[in-house]
Curated annotation (Swiss-Prot):
Protein name: Phenylalanine--tRNA ligase beta subunit
Binding-site residues, Mg(2+): 458, 464, 467-468
UniProt organism field: Syntrophus aciditrophicus (strain SB)
CDD domains: PheRS_beta_core, tRNA_bind_bactPheRS
Gene: pheT
BP GO terms, sorted: phenylalanyl-tRNA aminoacylation
Length: 804
């Protein structure tokens, strides 16, 4: 948000330099991103008075002027029709620079010498009036720099307002912070309304059909306005904060929004059918042309401001083209309302619209500031346009807006948390300076009852008050001290150790950790094609989601990683190896509280070793993923791992996926993402993913490392090719061998899989390599053969295999 220093000084006395203001605001929690000096885009323009005026002898439309700056008199040739002797005007002297890259030079115009130029507002870049020379107030000192006497120079702070501090989305909100920091009083504008037209009830009415989305709507009628340019002081204020001047009526609504933080809207009354305002939801597919002349197609959830026949504004976002203020507007209906933040946030997102009004409404405005802003705007419009304010105002509030009640503050608790010795009286003064009501609690020492102001929607607990006291007292005023007390070593949590080991191993194998939102789209289950009875379809819904795409809690990490892959692919990055350790949230069938479970998920996509000199490019496949899983378990010293192709997931390729088990306990699944899932996300590249239950793994993980002596004697290997049915899993044969519990068997692994010529149809050849080793002596051939024969026979007996 852009904040003008000169505007701030209207409400609080500031004797700090801009740099000091920036530092104090930042230390109080309002981070100033930049400080900019702004001013007019002209130089060497001074105040002068016309002392003589006559017609140019060689041109009918030009005049010869003599102007004085107090120190000298200069001849000027001018073509403006609005100047007279005695007028005080801006004079661009020789060498002056004005907008457009022009430099004023001494010249002869139709034979007459001109030593400068008399300027219009438009030529100086401080207004849009091009009808003639800018006429200045007669009391301005001659010869003085125009930028100085008109206060055209300013300092603008770019402040990053956090979402919880909507009260600071106004000049007065920031001024209140400065007043609290410096101890200076806050000077609020005096608001007075002179009602000198008929009663508003005669001409207008308001009906709210959806009080949940619009609990408060107020309006005033102003007759006989004259729409025209705003005065210079208002144009300068608006331009300093990045707003363009449009007309006096529209500028007032923007001025009050920036001043008080309450968005307003002015309707041309003649275009309001039946003189009515109806606040309702739109109908599905309803069309509306907004002020930017774009046609919007609405859904059934958009709150609209309508007249007796048609919609005239999108509530809290933008007005309609059909009721905008025009140069010939004479009567206006002025709106000030409170709209539900979630409604405005949803509508702005659905329509792809971002406006200053929506930005404030969706963060929460002051519910008690609606009438104040209405009267302030009516006052200014009447003053600047000559309009007459109708008697009374429409004030519909069918549903009260909830505000925070009293909060109990314990001063000792504050000092205990902060490590300070702030006196209770100082705490009370700090909170009063922030607009809070402070009442001492009867019969207690250093305890208060605090009533937060309605504009502080972020304060609801005692700890919030502690934060307010800390930041205004000054974080740099909190003493630094070391904790005192006996500290005993705390045993490390086994699951924390596990998570550290997982992160370290995956990072070491080229994976990058990502942290994604726990909130996902309700369509995630459909995109993943989860079965109707899958518990992951029972989602936990969020009451006030930021967006519809983040309205439910995730039940798997897979969708989140696929979205990361999608975003990277859209940015042109197709080679990706990522992982996440995070929580999922399951609703369950009992209807009670949801359960949280910790999961590990990995995703790989793209090319494998594409820079390897000895081979061409190859895409990552299922076996690359399986290698990652096996190395992960090896790093954790977990054994008994087996893979089962029966435990399939709907979002995985049925022929390239499997479940992961340790002994008989299911701990996850892995495989290639189903092509249909990738198609729903508009992705074509293969994605290899696995997800594991960290909680289940932690039960099997010891957290300690066991060392044993390695064998000093050589190994002996035997290769055997078995012919087995196609549906027999290799993992089962490996487990049969390992479960034989033969002491000499060190390892067994697959070295070949073949199906084709020489192997009967429906069969496959599976080559296994058996490794034998003793810790006491070199094995003889007979010793190896005896054990090897028993293991091979065990495999044959249990699988029906035959040796090829």
């Amino acid at each position: 948000m852009q904040v003008s220093l000169r505007w701030l000084k209207d409400y609080v006395d500031i004797d700090l330099t801009p740099a000091e203001v920036s530092d104090r605001l930042t230390m109080a929690g309002l981070e100033v991103d930049a400080v900019r000096e702004v001013g007019p885009s002209f130089s060497n323009v001074v105040v002068a008075r016309i002392i003589a005026l006559r017609r140019h002898p060689n041109a009918d439309k030009l005049s010869l002027c003599e102007v004085t700056t107090g120190d000298e008199t200069l001849p000027i040739v001018c073509g403006a029709p609005n100047i007279h002797v005695g007028d005080v005007v801006p004079l661009a002297r020789i060498g002056a620079e004005i907008p457009g890259g022009y430099t004023i030079k001494r010249s002869k115009i139709r034979g007459e010498l001109s030593e400068g130029m008399l300027c219009s507002e438009e030529e100086l870049g401080i207004g849009e009036d091009t009808t003639g020379v800018m006429i200045l107030p007669p009391n301005l000192p001659l010869g003085e720099d125009l930028a100085d006497v008109l206060d055209l120079k300013d300092t603008v702070f770019d402040i990053g307002i956090t979402p919880n501090r909507s009260d600071c989305l106004s000049i007065i909100g920031v001024a209140r912070e400065i007043a609290a920091i410096t101890g200076k009083p806050l000077k609020l504008p005096e608001i007075y309304v002179t009602e000198n037209a008929e009663d508003i009830q005669v001409s207008a009415s308001v009906q709210i059909l959806d009080p949940d989305l619009c609990p408060h709507y107020t309006a005033r009628m102003i007759r006989d306005v004259v729409v025209g340019p705003s005065p210079q002081w208002m144009r300068l204020r608006l331009e300093a904060v990045g707003l363009r001047s449009i007309s006096n009526v529209v500028d007032v609504t923007n001025f009050v929004m920036m001043e008080l933080g309450q968005p307003l809207h002015a309707f041309d009354y003649r275009f309001l059918e039946e003189g009515r305002i109806v606040v309702r939801r739109s109908t599905e597919g309803e069309k509306f042309i907004s002020l930017d002349e774009k046609e919007r197609v609405l859904n059934a959830n958009t709150l609209m401001i309508c007249d007796g026949v048609k919609p005239v504004a999108i509530a809290g976002i933008m007005g309609g083209f059909n009721s905008e203020i025009k140069p010939d507007t004479r009567d206006i209906l002025l709106e000030s309302a409170y709209f539900a933040p979630s409604s405005i946030r949803r509508s702005a997102r659905d329509l792809g619209m971002s406006t200053d009004a929506a930005f404030r409404f969706e963060r929460g405005i002051d519910p008690e500031g609606v009438l104040r802003a209405l009267d302030r705007a009516a006052q200014l419009i009447a003053e600047l346009s000559g309009g007459k304010i109708c008697k009374g105002r429409i004030d519909e509030h069918p549903k009260p807006v909830e505000t925070v009640g009293e909060i109990h503050l314990r001063c000792r608790k504050v000092n205990s948390l902060l490590g300070t010795n702030i006196p209770a009286a100082e705490m009370a003064d700090i909170l009063r300076g922030l607009g809070m009501e402070v009442t001492a609690k009867e019969g207690t020492v250093e305890e208060y009852r605090i009533k937060p102001p309605s504009f502080r929607v972020d304060i609801g607990r005692e700890i919030d008050l502690v934060e307010e006291i800390a930041r205004i007292h000054g974080y740099d005023n909190i003493p630094v001290s070391l904790p005192v007390g006996a500290m005993e070593p705390v045993p490390r949590d086994r699951r924390k150790i596990l998570e550290e080991r997982l992160r370290r191993h995956l990072a070491g194998t080229g994976f990058s950790e990502v942290i994604t939102y726990s909130f996902v789209s309700p369509t995630a289950a459909d995109i993943l094609a989860l079965d109707a009875g899958d518990e992951r379809r029972k989602v936990v819904r969020i009451k006030n989601p930021l967006t519809e795409d983040q309205s439910v809690m995730r039940t798997t990490l897979i969708y989140s990683l696929l979205k990361v892959m999608q975003e990277n692919a859209n940015a042109g990055d197709y080679d990706l190896k990522i992982f996440e350790i995070g929580k999922i949230f399951l609703q369950g069938n009992t209807g009670g509280l949801p359960t949280e479970k910790k999961r590990l998920a990995c995703l790989m996509t793209g090319m494998s070793d594409k820079e390897l000199w000895s081979s061409g490019e190859s895409r990552l496949d299922f076996y690359d993923l399986k290698g990652v899983v096996e190395s992960l378990f090896a790093s954790l010293n977990l054994t008994g791992i087996r893979y089962c192709s029966d435990a399939l997931q709907a979002f995985l390729h049925p022929g390239r996926s499997c479940g992961i088990f340790i002994d008989e306990k299911s701990i996850g699944y892995m495989g290639e993402a189903h092509p249909d899932v990738l198609s729903r996300l508009d992705m074509k590249n293969r994605a290899l993913i696995f997800e594991m239950d960290v909680d289940a793994i932690s039960e099997l993980f010891s957290g300690s490392v066991t060392y044993k002596e390695f064998s000093r004697y050589p190994e002996s290997s035997r290769d055997v090719a078995f012919v087995i049915d196609q549906d027999v899993e290799a993992d089962g044969m490996l487990n049969i061998a390992l479960n034989a519990r033969e002491e000499l068997l060190e390892n067994v692994c697959i070295f070949d899989v073949y199906a084709g010529a020489g192997v009967p149809e429906g069969k496959k050849s599976l080559g296994l390599r058996f490794t034998y080793r003793s810790y006491s002596a070199t094995l003889t051939d007979d010793e190896v053969s005896r054990v090897h024969s028993k293991i091979v026979q065990r495999i044959i007996d249990q699988t029906g295999a035959r040796v090829r």
